[in-house]
Amino acid sequence: MKKLFPLLLTLLLISSCEDSIEVTTTTNINESASVTILETNGTAINFNEVIEGDLNQLVSNFNSINDITIDSLSYTFANVTGNENAVITSATIEINATTVAVISNINIAQEALNGSVFEITDTAVLDQLETIFLNNSSVTVQLSGMAISDEGDVNFDLEFSMQLTAAF
């Protein structure tokens, strides 16, 4: 019995020493793309904008990451100048070739004026992006679609915000 207590204490200490300490860091990524849609004459025109980035520049020791969680992902329209009646008739937002949003019939100026924030909450999409980011540090955001701006040119920014937590 005298030897059992020290043995149990030793086993407890050894097993607790083996537990690894997980270190996490949270970072915010904010990027924007400036989009110009020229005046249309009753017919929607194509547009395509791309933002590229690298998580290595934002998260030190990126290669040591063993888990990534996207805490939030959203986009907004901002800094609209020109035609206030321009409409995105249809568009797709992709991150690393994964569709995160499909847009249709949005008045760009109205959404900017309202301060609308479009949250991406689909867990399947977020899980897919987390897996992609674990294997590839490059981030490519693409906005492509069709728009009508019959009353003149319109310029606006499409702003993306992503908060992610990385575990080492």
Predicted features along the sequence, with ranges:
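Sec-dependent signal peptide recognition
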Residues: 2-7
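C-terminal motif of bacterial Sec signal peptides marking the signal peptidase cleavage site
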Residues: 13-16
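N-terminal leader/pro-regions and domain N-caps
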Residues: 18-40, 165-168
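Post-signal-peptide N-terminal segment of Sec-exported extracytoplasmic proteins
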Residues: 37-72, 78, 83
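Short, surface-exposed beta-strand/strand-loop-strand elements in extracellular ectodomains
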Residues: 84-99
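An anionic, turn-rich surface loop/hairpin at beta-sheet edges
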Residues: 99-127
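Cysteine-clustered segments with highest specificity for TGF-beta superfamily mature ligands
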Residues: 116-161
